[in-house]
Curated annotation (Swiss-Prot):
Its cofactor is Zn(2+). Keywords: Hydrolase, Lipid A biosynthesis, Lipid biosynthesis, Lipid metabolism, Metal-binding, Zinc. GO terms for biological process: lipid A biosynthetic process. One of its GO terms (molecular function) is UDP-3-O-acyl-N-acetylglucosamine deacetylase activity. The lineage of its organism: Bacteria, Pseudomonadati, Campylobacterota, Epsilonproteobacteria, Campylobacterales. This is UDP-3-O-acyl-N-acetylglucosamine deacetylase. The active site is at residue 259. It comes from the Bacteria. It catalyses: a UDP-3-O-[(3R)-3-hydroxyacyl]-N-acetyl-alpha-D-glucosamine + H2O = a UDP-3-O-[(3R)-3-hydroxyacyl]-alpha-D-glucosamine + acetate.
């Protein structure tokens, strides 16, 4: 099984969730073993997508250094993971990726337009060899060894609309597109004023966010799935785990997880060399793992 990049360059435009300004995005092919690289054209600055380059996880996953930052990368990273793309350059002319409709389906459409190209290098995956867990009170995220990688996610909100929701996701591109990619980000009406006073969520609207009041959803079209909230959390988690640089072959289990806990989990994994193995998918090894790329 070979590494993949894009067959051609594709461009798009969307609104930034936090600044509320139009953002141009370009996805470009990259050579083998390059990974996922973000480039801010307005700063002439590149940022490799990796845990060590994460500088903030408060409202989104943010890459950066003393030159600047790129925020809200997780939805795009999630789509890239689902499509099995190993090497891509993402060019942005602003400090965040566009939010599009609040899900990753627009990025999936861009990747469909670009197509994929095999490179002359074997695909590599990260196989989890022993359990790794991060906790914050009763909240936790965990990776464990498995023969069939999946995500088991539970959320619990003190809100009548959301309440407690659980979802089990088995990795495949088809399953992702049908059941995860269209799940939108969400927020609470009571938090809007505070966020905007911090210059956050300035681009948030009913066009790109599920807005929840005490006992109702403000979006006139309603939900895309009855459990859209937890499905979106899975979308986010896939994007955050992609920062490890490989498709992760392990069970991810979360209770009330977050970008912050996901980031701590990726750091914990990398800290313990016995917790994982990087497997090169040559002809002799790929059969055991190829289902996850179907």
């Amino acid at each position: 099984m070979k590494q993949l990049t894009l067959a051609k360059t594709v461009k798009g435009v969307g609104i930034g969730l936090h600044k509320g300004e139009p953002i141009e995005i370009t996805l470009e092919p990259l050579e083998a073993n390059s990974g996922i690289v973000f480039f801010r054209s307005d700063l002439n600055a590149s940022y490799k997508a990796s845990p060590e380059n994460v500088i903030n996880t408060q409202m989104a996953t943010v890459l950066g250094d003393d030159r600047g930052f790129i925020s809200t990368i997780e939805h795009l990273m999630s789509a890239i993971n689902a499509y099995g793309i190993d090497n891509v350059r993402i060019v942005l002319n602003a400090n965040e990726a566009p939010v599009m409709d609040g899900s990753s389906i627009s990025f999936c459409m861009m990747l469909d337009e670009a197509g994929v190209k095999e490179l002359d290098a074997p695909k590599k995956i990260m196989v989890i060899k022993k359990p790794v867990e991060v906790r914050d009170g009763n909240k936790f995220v965990r990776l464990t060894p498995t023969k069939e990688p999946r995500i088991n996610y539970t959320i619990k909100f003190d809100n009548a609309v959301i309440g407690e929701q659980s979802y089990n996701f088995e990795f495949s591109k088809k399953n992702y597109i049908e059941n995860i990619a269209r799940a939108r980000t969400f927020g609470f009406l009571k938090d809007v004023q505070a966020l905007r006073s911090m210059n956050l969520a300035l681009g948030g609207s009913l066009e790109n966010t599920i807005v929840v009041d005490e006992n109702r959803i403000l979006n006139p079209e309603g939900l895309r799935f009855k459990d859209e909230f937890v499905r979106h959390k899975i979308l986010d988690a896939i994007g955050d785990l992609t920062l490890l640089g490989y498709r992760v072959f392990g069970d991810y289990i979360s209770y009330a997880g977050s970008h912050h806990l996901n980031h701590l989990l990726t750091k914990e994994v990398l800290k313990d060399k016995d917790a994982y193995e990087i497997v090169s998918l040559e002809k002799t090894t790929q059969k055991a793992y190829e289902k996850v790329f179907a």
